[in-house]
Amino acid sequence: MRIGLINVNGATPINELIQQVVQADKDGFDHFWFAHLPFNGYDALMSVSMAGQQTNRIELGTAVVPTYPRHPLILAQQALTTQVLAGGRLALGMGVSHKPVVENAMGLSYHRPAQQMREYLSIVRTLINDGQVDFNGELFNVKGVLDVPGSSPFPILVAALGPLMLRIAGELGDGTITWMVGQKTLESHIVPRINAAAESAGRPQPRVCVALPIAVTDDLAAAREYVARVYKRYGELTNYRRVLDIEGVAGPADVAVLGNEEQVERHLHALAEAGMTDFLAAICPIGDDPAASVARTWAFLKSLKRKT
């Protein structure tokens, strides 16, 4: 199990955010991920570029860049440029986002999202590996050359929760990034589907990067209240609601990793046994002293990382 952090707070100032990455690099975490939120916060790829200039070792990921607003040729160029600036440590997470975001906010058509991702990923993968593409599909016709000096290929992970997206992630990608997915859903739905798809395509076993809210705390009630309040909207979006229903739970508080050190460690090991390869910790500030709460969770994850 690889352990890292994810920032899902769009209000975090950029200098503070970069300092978190610098500290995570020093503390030995495997990766740090930047959420790309639709309505607030910083651009994920630009954040990776900036963090890459100030860190030495840690993998830097996007979770996740939306595909509909960007032509695949443009995203490939942006990502290859970011790979150069990040010193070859980029992990590109991308996804189709959600119908209300794409159609209501952006004014675009959320047309055939699975086919859009299949073709989009095929184009981007070919461009980063070969530097050129000649693709004729049902949704995209792309012919172009891309030369980004000093760049190199990087892993591409797909935000995949449904059967079609999991098949695409396994057949064409390097893994998936999940959010609000619990142990039961990992074991019965996510992992079997993506692993079977990768095996059928002759690809290596995919990464299963599981992002969840986490708090090491003795006040479980306060932690559950925080997660239920702050992450309420995720329980209302169709894609997340489906996996919460598969899990058989009411909302985000029921899949969050909460409790004291012993309880949280057991929870993380259970997720790993269910097939999680990477944990992306969205640390929650709980109680009257948020800084102390975050520090306790960070220290626990740091110590757990040393044991793995």
Name each model feature, range by range:
Residues 1-308:
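Active-site-adjacent structural elements that line small-molecule/cofactor binding pockets in enzymes
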